[in-house]
């Protein structure tokens, strides 16, 4: 089984760069407090790093 991480949106995407909004959608996050579980891959880690100021990550 692949290792997973939990990603939770902690801040609003209103007024953010369009690229950052698209990254949140790509991660599957829709609203503040929404949590998704994703595979721990370099691609997902890169997306999380881009919007790290808006999300919380749990290993």
From Swiss-Prot:
Keywords: Ribonucleoprotein, Ribosomal protein. The keyword Ribonucleoprotein applies. One of its GO terms (molecular function) is structural constituent of ribosome. Gene3D superfamilies: Ribosomal protein L30, ferredoxin-like fold domain. One of its GO terms (biological process) is translation. InterPro entries: Ribo_uL30_ferredoxin-like_sf, Ribosomal_uL30_bac-type, Ribosomal_uL30_CS, Ribosomal_uL30_ferredoxin-like. SUPFAM superfamilies: Ribosomal protein L30p/L7e. This is Large ribosomal subunit protein uL30. It comes from Yersinia pestis. The lineage of its organism: Bacteria, Pseudomonadati, Pseudomonadota, Gammaproteobacteria, Enterobacterales.
């Amino acid at each position: 089984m692949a290792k997973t991480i939990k990603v939770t949106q902690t801040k609003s995407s209103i007024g953010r760069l369009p690229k950052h909004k698209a990254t949140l959608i790509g991660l599957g996050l829709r609203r503040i407090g929404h949590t998704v579980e994703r595979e721990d891959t370099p691609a997902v880690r890169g997306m999380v790093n881009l919007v790290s100021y808006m999300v919380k990550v749990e290993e």
